[in-house]
């Protein structure tokens, strides 16, 4: 059997990554389990009716706080992604056939859990003619129809920057349209070979021009410098991006990119203050922050200070 050149390259990359042992976490990379009444009730419900959330399946350290706020995240499109990012724990491979009933099931899960706010994310589906745009848009509409008071945040891939695909997704009108840049230009191709930095910025610009509240994320500890982080934050703000989260990279396995550096908590404070100075409406940074952490609160904060459609000077 002939192995495709791209597959060979990825195998070599994973072999090289595996030469570096899993890094020992510093003392500030820890969280306390605070199991309040809302979390406990939701946990029991999820077990009783066999629901599946990214929060549990990814072992998110913030699940206690988010579930206490009645917020949860769902992954759509299957468990195989057509792209490979060197920080992501989702497997790369040939996805299963499109499940057209998935939007209904997600909407019913949101209803059953009584969520106030939900984040929907998914895998890249370059195998589909529309890149999965129908699935993302239909899931948002299904949630809104069944749960009119629930806020919906949609975290999307770039759909190869195709305007028609993006328009279909934007027309579903999520409360927040998120697309994560994740890292800085110098190492972008190494970390996210199937994406481009500028195209990701263009997706955010297009979403902002469509009148949506927009959001992105930067992962630190992949080899970036402080100046590069500040430049990337400025680039995001120039697109009109409203909300940004700044996070620490936690290596999923030895196959993934090694942790280059553990960013100290005080550095996150400095980056957060810098981002606020740039004019982001909502900023959250920290070693255990994830892009969907406190998503509902960040949206409310941004919506309260932002005028939809306002242009940002470039």
Swiss-Prot record:
An example Gene Ontology CC term for this record: cytoplasm
Cofactor: [4Fe-4S] cluster
Domain of life: Bacteria
Every Radical SAM core domain range: 67-281
Molecular functions per Gene Ontology: 4 iron, 4 sulfur cluster binding; lipoate synthase activity; metal ion binding
The enzyme's E.C. designation: 2.8.1.8
List of residues binding [4Fe-4S] cluster 2: 81, 85, 88
Pathway membership: Protein modification; protein lipoylation via endogenous pathway; protein N(6)-(lipoyl)lysine from octanoyl-[acyl-carrier-protein]: step 2/2
SMART domains linked to this entry: Elp3 (SM00729)
Catalytic activity: [[Fe-S] cluster scaffold protein carrying a second [4Fe-4S](2+) cluster] + N(6)-octanoyl-L-lysyl-[protein] + 2 oxidized [2Fe-2S]-[ferredoxin] + 2 S-adenosyl-L-methionine + 4 H(+) = [[Fe-S] cluster scaffold protein] + N(6)-[(R)-dihydrolipoyl]-L-lysyl-[protein] + 4 Fe(3+) + 2 hydrogen sulfide + 2 5'-deoxyadenosine + 2 L-methionine + 2 reduced [2Fe-2S]-[ferredoxin]
EC class: transferase
Subcellular location field: Cytoplasm
Textual note on the cofactor: Binds 2 [4Fe-4S] clusters per subunit. One cluster is coordinated with 3 cysteines and an exchangeable S-adenosyl-L-methionine.
Family from the record: Belongs to the radical SAM superfamily. Lipoyl synthase family.
NCBIfam families with a match to the protein in the record: lipA, PRK05481.1, PRK12928.1
Name under which the protein is recorded: Lipoyl synthase
Gene: lipA
């Amino acid at each position: 059997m002939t192995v495709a050149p791209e597959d060979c390259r990825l195998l070599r990359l994973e072999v090289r990554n595996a030469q570096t042992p899993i890094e020992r976490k510093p003392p500030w990379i820890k969280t306390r389990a605070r199991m309040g009444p809302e979390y406990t009730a939701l946990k029991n419900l999820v077990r009783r009716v066999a629901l599946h959330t990214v929060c549990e399946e990814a072992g998110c350290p913030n699940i206690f706080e988010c579930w206490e706020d009645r917020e949860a995240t769902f992954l759509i499109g299957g468990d195989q992604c057509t792209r490979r990012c060197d920080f992501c724990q989702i497997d790369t491979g040939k996805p299963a056939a499109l499940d057209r009933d998935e939007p209904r099931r997600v909407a019913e899960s949101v209803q059953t859990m009584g969520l106030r706010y939900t984040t929907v994310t998914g895998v890249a589906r370059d195998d589909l003619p529309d890149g999965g745009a129908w699935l993302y848009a239909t899931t948002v509409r299904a949630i809104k129809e069944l749960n009119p008071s629930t806020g919906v945040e949609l975290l999307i891939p770039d759909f190869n920057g195709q305007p028609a695909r993006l328009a279909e997704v934007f027309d579903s009108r999520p409360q927040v349209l998120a697309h994560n840049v994740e890292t800085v230009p110098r190492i972008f191709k190494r970390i996210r070979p199937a994406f481009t930095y500028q195209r990701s910025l263009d997706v955010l610009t297009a979403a902002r021009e469509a009148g949506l509240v927009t959001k992105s994320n930067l992962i630190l500890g992949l080899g970036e410098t402080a100046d590069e982080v500040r430049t990337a934050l400025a680039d995001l703000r120039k697109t009109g991006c409203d909300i940004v989260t700044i996070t620490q990279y936690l290596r999923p396995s030895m196959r993934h990119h090694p942790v280059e550096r553990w960013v100290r908590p005080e550095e996150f404070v400095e980056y957060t203050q810098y981002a606020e100075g740039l004019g982001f409406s909502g900023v959250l940074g920290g070693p255990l922050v994830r892009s969907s952490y406190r998503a509902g609160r960040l949206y409310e904060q941004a919506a309260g200070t932002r005028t939809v459609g306002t242009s940002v000077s470039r």
